[in-house]
Amino acid sequence: MYRYLGEALLLSRAGPAALGSASADSAALLGWARGQPAAAPQPGLALAARRHYSEAVADREDDPNFFKMVEGFFDRGASIVEDKLVEDLRTRESEEQKRNRVRGILRIIKPCNHVLSLSFPIRRDDGSWEVIEGYRAQHSQHRTPCKGGIRYSTDVSVDEVKALASLMTYKCAVVDVPFGGAKAGVKINPKNYTDNELEKITRRFTMELAKKGFIGPGIDVPAPDMSTGEREMSWIADTYASTIGHYDINAHACVTGKPISQGGIHGRISATGRGVFHGIENFINEASYMSILGMTPGFGDKTFVVQGFGNVGLHSMRYLHRFGAKCIAVGESDGSIWNPDGIDPKELEDFKLQHGSILGFPKAKPYEGSILEADCDILIPAASEKQLTKSNAPRVKAKIIAEGANGPTTPEADKIFLERNIMVIPDLYLNAGGVTVSYFEWLKNLNHVSYGRLTFKYERDSNYHLLMSVQESLERKFGKHGGTIPIVPTAEFQDRISGASEKDIVHSGLAYTMERSARQIMRTAMKYNLGLDLRTAAYVNAIEKVFKVYNEAGVTFT
């Protein structure tokens, strides 16, 4: 696999002119790289001056609205994959009819199916009344239930929830999670409300969603997002199970990200950040990509910067630190800190819990200037959308941008990064760890049993029986006078013998999902000569998978 990736990537670095004059050599190179009998590629291809990336979308406005931004990325991927989708249709239709069918389904995929806008009153603790605004967007129901988080923010808007819902559709498709995309937002600043008021808002919002059919284990399953967590998810589950879902045995599957006592799953809190780590790991250990960037594989000598020290930023920082990378700067909305010798994530977490801010952390200095432009190897924007724009993209010094947040890079900035040979690991792949583990939690709730409970003891006993069998076989063959030949397992194997916990199973499933999806993205990038344009490769994969569902299910009532 590594040789194939490395050699085929040489072609993706070729400029458009070189590719145009060597179309016959393209197939030869890919076949040769796979080990198939074919003529070796011409050396000139490997020496092309510039990489090639998708030019399917013309220049757009510098900072488009969020939903149009996602639509632009979708259009880029759709224009590249359209011919293949037409070619793969096995019908008796003419070429024109096939193309019309493909374009029709692509038009079905693109827009948001449903958007619910809500307003409801609450009485605050001081006796005053306030009207709360909220939204829930369901982008696609090609798979049900729909899946997407609920965020509490004063920046919530219809455009934002539509954009985030569409990203969820493509995100689920990229990592093969069988959900449609959705997103919700409540337009409040949670810091301005008491816990009692937040509970009122959350429970009332749940009831409004339920009345309109926008929540349910098989309909629409929310999850935590910005400024929400286990507590809010527990309120949602309890509200649904106590009212509209009181006859439904699967009622607690109406939401994920719950506390363990309410049907949650071990490993969900850190899932998105752990997914970010695994996503970076898959690309940073790929020698062919690192050679393009002029870097060595592995985390050992790498520095990184995190923008946003929330759930995603903290856990991303924690895992990268654990595997040898050094965090030299952390930024939040109220300021940034910097230490070239490294910042310990546990110490910074404890300091923030105690003081409410990272500013004043004794083992780092205040950082003047934009944290996004700090000198580092890996930049992790884990805050909010549209942080990297046309104006600051030329000054970004990182070689790898790992999108922990949703939509942190605008199309114009994305184009600049590609021209500057900077690798952007896209959001729809990189932060899919959360929805992946949410899927595991949803399955756990439907099965009504935790992972491994039925097999823990059986597997542990089987391992011990295997060791005893090996020991007895050795003693019969080599033992003298009935002497024993003890079999001593290593510490790592001893941990395995003791049986995998639910967290071990979740972590293993997440790592496998991220690795498999990364390989799919790499293969697609090579197939379409996209070079470092991993975002378009991810969108191509997502579009192909969603298209296949619509095409094979058939389009009803048209």
Swiss-Prot record:
> Where does the protein end up?
Mitochondrion; Endoplasmic reticulum
Q: Identify residues that carry N6-(2-hydroxyisobutyryl)lysine.
A: K147
Q: Residues bearing N6-acetyllysine?
A: 84, 110, 162, 171, 183, 187, 191, 211, 326, 346, 352, 363, 365, 386, 390, 399, 415, 457, 477, 480, 503, 527, 545, 548
Q: Which domain of life is it from?
A: Eukaryota
Binding positions for NAD(+)? Q141, H142, R143, D176, H252, K444
Q: What is the effect of changing R322H?
A: In HHF6; diminished sensitivity to GTP
Q: Which SUPFAM superfamilies match?
A: Aminoacid dehydrogenase-like, N-terminal domain, NAD(P)-binding Rossmann-fold domains
Q: What is the effect of changing R274C?
A: In HHF6; diminished sensitivity to GTP
Q: Which residues carry this modification: N6-succinyllysine?
A: 68, 84, 110, 162, 183, 191, 200, 346, 352, 363, 365, 390, 415, 457, 477, 480, 503, 527, 545
PTM annotation (Phosphoserine): residues: S79, S128, S227, S384
Provide the residue positions that the database annotates as binding GTP: H266, S270, Y319, R322
Q: Which residues carry this modification: Phosphothreonine?
A: T410
Q: Give EC number(s), comma-separated.
A: 1.4.1.3
Coiled-coil features, chain-numbered ranges: none
A biological process (GO) annotation for this entry? Answer: positive regulation of insulin secretion
What is annotated as the active site?
K183
Task: Spell out the activity regulation.
Answer: Subject to allosteric regulation. Activated by ADP. Inhibited by GTP and ATP. ADP can occupy the NADH binding site and activate the enzyme. Inhibited by SIRT4. Inhibited by HADH.
Q: Does the keyword Endoplasmic reticulum apply?
A: yes
Residue positions binding ADP? S450, R516
Q: Recount the PTM note.
A: ADP-ribosylated by SIRT4, leading to inactivate glutamate dehydrogenase activity. Stoichiometry shows that ADP-ribosylation occurs in one subunit per catalytically active homohexamer.
Q: Cellular component per GO?
A: cytoplasm; endoplasmic reticulum; mitochondrial matrix; mitochondrion
Q: Which UniProt keywords apply?
A: Acetylation, ADP-ribosylation, ATP-binding, Disease variant, Endoplasmic reticulum, GTP-binding, Hydroxylation, Mitochondrion, NADP, Nucleotide-binding, Oxidoreductase, Phosphoprotein, Transit peptide
Q: Which disease is it linked to?
A: Hyperinsulinemic hypoglycemia, familial, 6: A form of hyperinsulinemic hypoglycemia, a clinically and genetically heterogeneous disorder characterized by inappropriate insulin secretion from the pancreatic beta-cells in the presence of low blood glucose levels. HHF6 is an autosomal dominant form characterized by hypoglycemia due to congenital hyperinsulinism combined with persistent hyperammonemia. Clinical features include loss of consciousness due to hypoglycemia, hypoglycemic seizures, and mental retardation.
Q: What does this protein do?
A: Mitochondrial glutamate dehydrogenase that catalyzes the conversion of L-glutamate into alpha-ketoglutarate. Plays a key role in glutamine anaplerosis by producing alpha-ketoglutarate, an important intermediate in the tricarboxylic acid cycle. Plays a role in insulin homeostasis. May be involved in learning and memory reactions by increasing the turnover of the excitatory neurotransmitter glutamate.
Entry similarity comment: Belongs to the Glu/Leu/Phe/Val dehydrogenases family.
What is this protein called in UniProt?
A: Glutamate dehydrogenase 1, mitochondrial
- In its UniProt entry, the species of origin is given as Homo sapiens
